[in-house]
Amino acid sequence: MKLPADLRSYSQITRNSIAMILAGGRGTRLRQLTDWRAKPAVPFGGKFRIIDFPLSNCVNSGIRRIGVATQYKAQSLISHIQQGWGFLDGRFQEFIELLPAQQRTEESWYQGTADAVYQNIDILRSHNPDYVLILGGDHVYKMDYAKLLADHIAKSAEMTIACIDLPLEEASAFGVMSVTKDGRVTDFTEKPSVPTAVPGRPGYALVSMGIYVFNADFLFDQLIRDHDDPNSSHDFGKDLIPHLVPRSRVFTHRFSDSCVNMVSGVPYWRDVGTVEAYWEANLDLVQVTPDLNLYDQDWPIWTHQEQLPPAKFVFDNDDRRGQALDSMVSGGCIISGATVRRSLLFSNVQVRSYSVLEDSVILPNVDVGRNARLRRVVVDKNCIIPPGLEVGFDPVEDRKHFYVTETGVTLVTPEMLGQKIHYVR
C-alpha cells in the first residue's frame, strides 16, 4: 500500500491510537436481511461482510488495536471475525477484541452509542491510548484514518467528526452540522426534519459519517459526565456531540481529504441501510469502472477466505448456454446452462439450466432451480429457488409472498419460501 512521506510521524500516531467499532445495531430498514444477523454482518460485494470495510481501513491505516462492540444477534459477526481476522500479532500488542454487552457497570445492555463505549471504558483505559477512534460497523467506504488523526492533531481538536456533503433529501437520516471556515463545528443537529444547507452549495448538507476522533482522556471524562446525566439517552449524535459543540474544540474532517483512491473524484461512502440501497451498492460493483474499487491492491479489503474452487460455466448449446454478462461471480459458483446478466453472485451459488437472472444480488449458498426467472431481486443466504419460479415481473403477486420496495426491488428469504433454516447467517 502507498504510505505517506512522513511515515514515522503517522506510525507513531496510529500506534498510540485505539479504534472502537460499534457493531451492535440491527439495521431494521434492511427488513428480513437482519432477522438473523446484525447489520455489520450482512454480506456485501460478493465475498465480504460490511464489517470488513472499517476493519480493513483500520489495519491498512496502521491501527492494530481494535475493539468491536457487539449486541444484536452477534453470532455470525463473531464467527466471521474469529475465522477471518486472527492474523494480528499479539506479541506486538495488535488485537481485535470482541466486546459484547457484559453488564460490567450495571445491569443493562448497551443503551446507546456512547453507552457502548462507556461500558468498556476500563478496557480502553487499560491500553493507555492517546487517541480513540469511534467507528460505525455498517458503512461501506475506504478511508485512511491516519490522515484523519493527523488532521485532528494539527487543529488541536478535542473531538473531530468526519463529514461528507449529502443531498438535502438524504441528510435527514444523519447528524447535520454548521461549521466555520476553519472547520470548527458551531451547530450539530441529529436527524433534523429540515437540514441546513451548506453555504454556497444549495441542495446539500454537511453530515456526520459517524466517525469520530477523541483525545482519550477528554473522551473518558465526557463519557462519565454523560453517564451521570439522567436526561441523556447516552448517544453520541443525540446527546454527547450537541453538548460538546458550544463548550469544546470540535472540528470537522472532510472525507475527501482521506478517501483512498477515489475513482471519479467523488469520495465513495454508502450507508447500505435499506434493501434498495443495499441492492444498488452491490450492483454498482458490476460496472466497468465502479466508484468502489475492490481490485485496489494498495488498499485491500481483508476478509475470511473460504477455500473454494473457481466459478464454473457449463453447457454451450443453442438452447442453453452457461454465461454471465456484466456480472461478478464468486468462487464455488456453477452457472449450468443458465444466463446471468448485470448481477452479483456470492460464493457457492448454483444456477441451473434455462434459468435467467437479471439485475440481481444472490447471497451465498443459493440454489436456483431450472427455468426460474429472477429480476431486480436480493436473495438471502441458503434459499432454494423452486424450478419455474418468477420474481420481479409482477409486483402485485410478489408482494403476496416477498418484501418489495417502492421501486420494485424484491427481497427473498428462506422463510418467505417456506424453508425453515435454524442457524446463523
UniProtKB/Swiss-Prot annotation:
Which PROSITE patterns does this one have?
Answer: ADP_GLC_PYROPHOSPH_1 (PS00808), ADP_GLC_PYROPHOSPH_2 (PS00809), ADP_GLC_PYROPHOSPH_3 (PS00810)
**Catalysed reactions listed for this entry:** alpha-D-glucose 1-phosphate + ATP + H(+) = ADP-alpha-D-glucose + diphosphate
A Pfam family cross-referenced in the UniProt record is NTP_transferase
Q: Which keywords has UniProt assigned to this entry?
A: ATP-binding, Carbohydrate metabolism, Glycogen biosynthesis, Glycogen metabolism, Nucleotide-binding, Nucleotidyltransferase, Transferase
For the keyword Membrane, the answer is no
The organism's superkingdom is given as Bacteria
Alphabetized Gene3D superfamilies for the sequence: Hexapeptide repeat proteins (2.160.10.10), Spore Coat Polysaccharide Biosynthesis Protein SpsA, Chain A (3.90.550.10)
Q: Any one Gene Ontology biological process term?
A: glycogen biosynthetic process
Its pathway? Glycan biosynthesis; glycogen biosynthesis
| InterPro entries documented for this protein | ADP-Glc_PPase, ADP_Glu_pyroP_CS, GlgC_bac, GlmU/GlgC-like_hexapep, NTP_transferase_dom, Nucleotide-diphossugar_trans, Trimer_LpxA-like_sf
Q: Which residues make up the binding site for alpha-D-glucose 1-phosphate?
A: 110, 175, 190-191, 208
Any one GO MF term held by the record is: glucose-1-phosphate adenylyltransferase activity
Could you tell me the EC number(s) of this protein? Answer: 2.7.7.27
Q: What does this protein do?
A: Involved in the biosynthesis of ADP-glucose, a building block required for the elongation reactions to produce glycogen. Catalyzes the reaction between ATP and alpha-D-glucose 1-phosphate (G1P) to produce pyrophosphate and ADP-Glc.
The record's annotation in HAMAP family points to: GlgC
This protein's assembly is summarised as: Homotetramer.
What family, per the record? Belongs to the bacterial/plant glucose-1-phosphate adenylyltransferase family.
Record-linked PANTHER family: GLUCOSE-1-PHOSPHATE ADENYLYLTRANSFERASE (PTHR43523:SF2), GLUCOSE-1-PHOSPHATE ADENYLYLTRANSFERASE-RELATED (PTHR43523)
- The name of this protein is Glucose-1-phosphate adenylyltransferase
Q: What is the lineage of its organism?
A: Bacteria, Pseudomonadati, Pseudomonadota, Betaproteobacteria, Nitrosomonadales
